[in-house]
Structure formats: C-alpha cells, structure tokens
Amino acid sequence: MQQFDVVILGAGSAGENLANTLAQGSKSVAIIEEHRVGGECGFVACVPSKILLRAAEVRLLLHEAHQLGAVAASLDAGDGRAAYARAVARRDAIVPDDDGFGAQQFADNGVTLIRGRGIILRPGVIGVGDDELGYTDLVIATGSAPTVPPIPGLDTVPTWTSDQALTSPEFPTSLIVMGGGAVGCELAQIYAAFGTAVTLVQSAPQLLPQEEPKIAAILADALRANGIDLRLDVEATKASRTDDGGVALTLKDSTILHAERLLLAVGRDPRVEGIGLDKLGITPGEKGLETDEYCRVRGQEHVWAGGDVAGIAPFTHTASYHAKILTANLLGQHKQADYRAIPRAVYTTPTVASVGLTAAQAREQGYTISTAGVDLRDTARAETEGTTHGRLELIADKARGILIGAAAIGPHADAWLGEATLAIRAEVPLDLLSEVIRAFPTFNEVYVEALDQLRGDGD
C-alpha cells in the first residue's frame, strides 16, 4: 500500500490548488478524481456560462444601439437559432475537451493523480478500485452536483440540469427555468436573448432570495424587459410529458405551463454520498461537512474539507480560498478562515454583486445598523452609458463605524463592488472611506453619496 502525507478526494478548484501548493511545500500528495481535473467550473459551469452570457449581452445591446445614437435605426439581431449555434461554437472552441493541462501540472509538481472513485475504507486508508492508499491527513473536496427536486413526473419529461444545458448544442424554442437564483437567472437571460420563449418559476417571493429585495426587484424588471415571464412565489407540483414530447408543468396555483424543455436550477447538493464517511464517524449536514475555522471537519483531527462540500459558499473563489487556508494548516501554520467578505456575483445584464451581510441578516445577528441606497442614475457615468438599471446599497455597523455588507446592480457591478469587499475585509472606517478620491466619471462615484448617507446615520 502506498503511503502519502496527504490524500485529497476531488480535483476541483479546492483540491487542484491545494495539491499543487502542498507538493511544492515538500508534502507527498495523492489526489483522486473520478471525472476531470479542474472540477466543473471550467468545463460545465462558470466559464461556458460566461461565454454565452457575453454573447447574450451583445445581442441585448443591439437593441440599445439606436437609443445611444450609434445607428440610424434599431438593429435586427438576426436569426436567434443561427446566432446561438455560433455562440455555442465559440464556447466549444474556448472550453477544453480534456483536463490535460491540469494533469500535467500535477505531474510537474510531483502530485500523484489517481483516476477513479475514492472511498474511505477505514481511518487512514482510501480505496480506489482494488488499490489502497494510506494517508496521514485526508482532505475531502468532492464538490457538489445540481439538485433534482422531488417533483412527481419529473423523470418522464425532457429536463436539463445547468451542467447539461451549458454543454448542449440544442436550442429550445421554449423553456421553463425552475429556480430564480444566480444560475436560473443567468440561463433564463441567455436563452431569452437568442429568442427562446422563457418562463422562470421561483418558489420564493423574489429572485435571488439571499439578496437585498430592491436589488432583486431591479433585476426582475430587467428580465421582464427581456421578455422573460416571471412566476414568483409559486411552486411546481407535477410534471408530465405532452403528446409532442414537451413538458407540462403544473404549479401550486393550478396554472399549467408548457414548454419544449424544463431546465432545473434549484441549487446544488454536496457530494457526500457513497464515499465512506461513516467509516470515520462523520455525519454530513444538509449543506455538507461542518468544518471549524481551520477547515478541519468537526470532531476529526486529520480530516479536512474545502470547496462546495464544506457548505460555506458554493463559489470557485471560495474553493480557491479554502485551498490557501488548508495549505497553511497542513504545513503547520495554524491559519484561520475569515468569511466576512466573500463576494457574490450574478452575471446577468445588468450584473448583480454583493458581499457580506444583508440588512436582514445583520439585524438577525444582533447588529445595530445604518443603511444607505443610491440609484446609479444619479452618477454621470450612468448618463454616458445610457444606463437606467442600477443601484448600490450599503450596510454599516453603527457601533464600529464600518461596512458589514454591500449589494449592487448595474454594468460591471462585480468590478466596482470590489471597493466594498476590501473595506469590509479590512474594516476600513467609514470616515476614511469617505475621503477616498474616486475617478470621474466612474460608477464608483455612487459610493460618495451612499457613504454620506451612512455618516449622516442613513436609515
């Protein structure tokens, strides 16, 4: 049996980064991957979705060309099906077919890559097929998979998960998107921009239920303007196959929706089944494995977790951050994770971005807060861009005079919210933030009025 200092289950963003840095730190490392090195982000999620979202954004901008004075009359975006085929061809040209690059990095760094499914056999031993590997420390980084909701009849109708949609060349003429989170909103806008008749069904009263209501409402208006039929605060109760092979989805209010296909975007589940956690006495929670501030699985001395399976925030950048924390701790440096400023982004047009706590979350946690909100239309940059959809909201802890949350919607909001991300992480005083000189004309100017509101006590 081969013995390693560290064995990692899963070569996604957390596992891949961790394996390479640990090996460079003179640890003997084996990493076990059942699918592809690099995880889902680069192959079936983040990267292909952003390629298609960029194409969708350009098509939407064509409708604004006349308003901006760029052309004499409104431009026709042309046949959506043909355009989608071209966008898919570009997607497939950019997204790699295999994981050769990642596998070669492992080889260059001395990481042992083992293809297959790793299962915990007993403390200190992992099985892969007929082989056994010994470890001193085990890192579980198995990621997550799209949630399939328990709706009667779902197995009889043509469905996609988000992973399947983002790798398929198929262009449906009509589509029901189930789920109004980040993935559901992005995919709904992609297909609508190319001409698909899209209906989005969301069980919560608003889109993006974890975000500020005013931000979510602005996004809802934008999606409706794209022709997307939003059905909010309603659940699906039954699915059935129509005579023409499509979908009939029955809602709780007895409405029946029809479409060529149903796209499931209701969340993701941590991959914790069938990997032998019971052999270590580990019982996962609904969100995954519970970890301490060092990314160690609670109740375990030599078992760690990172990425989606740790249940903190299901983002690639969180997984990469976990890799840094895990590297430090497995090398004996005792570094604690700090999750106060994990940015979130929804790459729709307009873009939604947020960081830290919402106002509701802050109040629930006992903070006495002040809040501020400013529309982007109050900035010169919004005038030059012809932007009508946009807003910044800030949440401050009154007692300490620092930001603890921020949310934004507007062009490139993911970029200009970086100022708030840094301010929250570094606990920059509001007085100091107010003294920052911001270039004119930029969207960052919206911070000036918002910070003035906070210093004047906001709400």
Positions of the model-derived regions?
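A Rossmann-like FAD-binding core segment of flavoenzymes
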Residues: 112-115, 119-127, 194-293, 298, ...
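Flexible, glycine-rich terminal cap/loop adjacent to redox cofactors
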Residues: 7-35, 40, 47, 51-58, ...
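Beta1/beta-strand and adjacent pyrophosphate-binding region of the FAD-binding site
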Residues: 1-12, 171-181
